[in-house]
Amino acid sequence: MDYCIFPPEEMPEGTIDLPLSKSISNRVLILNALTGNRGRIERTAECDDTAVMLTALSQTSDEVNIGAAGTAMRFLTAYFAMQPGRTVTITGTERMCNRPIALLVDALRQCGASIEYVDKEGYPPLKIHGCRLTGGDITLPASVSSQYVSALLMTAPLMEHGLKLTLTDGIVSLPYIKMTLGLMKEWGVDSDFTDNVITVEPQLYTPVDFKVEADWSAASYWYEIEALSSGDLSLRGLSRNSLQGDSHVADFFTGLGVNSEWDGDVMELMPSPDLTPRITLDMSEQPDLAQTVVVTCAMLGLPFHITGLSTLKIKETDRLTALRDELRKLSFVIDIVDDNALEWEGARCPVDTSHPVVIDTYQDHRMAMAFAPVALYIPGLIIRNADVVTKSYPEYWDHLRSIGFTTKEVDADTLLNNI
């Protein structure tokens, strides 16, 4: 399904009830499962990734297909590794089976896990023979994915000797690790995080009742719309004292012309004339916001140098290349620097204006949602495979229409072939 998008006839206006946090939902489902599901989670995110996690944790079959859900692949690998007497093969999409997982598997093996590679060494599918994990002292490069760290931490209290985890090579997405430890604390588990060493002693989780907060990553797309339109938008469901590192979106967008102010439990977004002339950011702790910020900067004509993006190459797609290629369709010449940064100093290139702009999403939900607001500047912009947003934000298009955008279902290939 491809969407042709047209902007509101008037200034965008409305209050958005944001979806619940996917990151928190996936963690609390694992934590609750480790208590024997004796706690009560009021609601979880209603997106594909969390649905995959729910299904995998409830089924008893010996094969689990997690589709394109990278978080589920990593968390469930650790979870199933410590289910004695159960053997599970976990697989996913072709892209998922080309995303490396050796660092996590090696770490789990050091903890006593029995895991085999079904096809290619270092990549899913995995055949996991559940057993009691011993734990102990291990070292893990933390520069690739914080989800490896979180997967180990959530299972650590139930390991025979607990876990002393030394992180090397620089820690990416640190707020996600802190989120995991914070949620473990909610379930009664203590930990110590000193310098680059995390220690979790053997202990039991305590069942709790838990309410998941709204998703700050989802909020970022409304900040983008506010920045590009100077509309009148409000966001409901966010937490003031959030565990989510992406709550920094409010700080990032102050330099992009958006101020934020709480009114009770609603975050009001307000236009500001203050634009930072050149944006310089380290987004190593908020990589999921990178696409939104990069596209916003480009559309506002603000040169930028954004670092800390090394993990974007192993996301749903190679997001560095995808951003560079799709922004070039809009005339922006973006440079990838050392596979860790994106830079734009104002260079533009000619574009063919004889046909609609078609944005490829590469089966990446964040590509679709980061580029859709560009329709404010380019009416008739086409987003290919628009339904990919169900991975994290199924209501996205409905919410976009609720503030005046128009979406028309089209076939991008047919349109381009008829020109």
Where are these regions (language model features)?
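Structural preference for solvent-exposed beta-strand-turn elements
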Residues: 1-419
